């Protein structure tokens, strides 16, 4: 399958989400068609990609010889992509009725769709740089959903979520620098990227980078001591809590 199809599950939900944000509040039918149509189309493309994997990754931009923004699909990313493709449409169906009582539906469904594209980007990342980009973009996309009610509890939960996510981002960034310094590439490759024959000092740096990456990415997985954002984020509408627990924690973390 053409590697350019990897862009569809990422960009299509983002475009439909942006379109939903521009609708008038009373255009419920049009909103539901846009949201469900974009999600189902993206999920169908994910299914097609899993059944007929592209022969090579799609490189979107290169930062020299060892860094790039690229998308790809292997066995593990296919599992996570299928998880998104199945869970998101079901949550959307539930949300259409649920959000009638919550208000600000355009805002909710706009960022709901955008988050689909961002999380699909996490699943389809073919390099550590790409994963980091979408991983941090997921924080920005889900923050308006966590703070949907905009009351005291929601604002507090949003601030905690943002601060812990920024702390995790900083730790991962430092670990990427170390891996770029001592590794062979930042692409996801079979057999790993750590060369043989590293000195004791270089190995110590990489051990530290691993610990930073573990806790940095562990923020989304609610790893102790960075777990407190998850129960606080339960003030968000129920569909958001479901996705945070079932998708963001399981897959993003």
Kindly give the residue locations of the regions a language model identified:
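C-terminal ends of transmembrane helices
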Residues: 17-28, 89-101, 144-153, 221-234
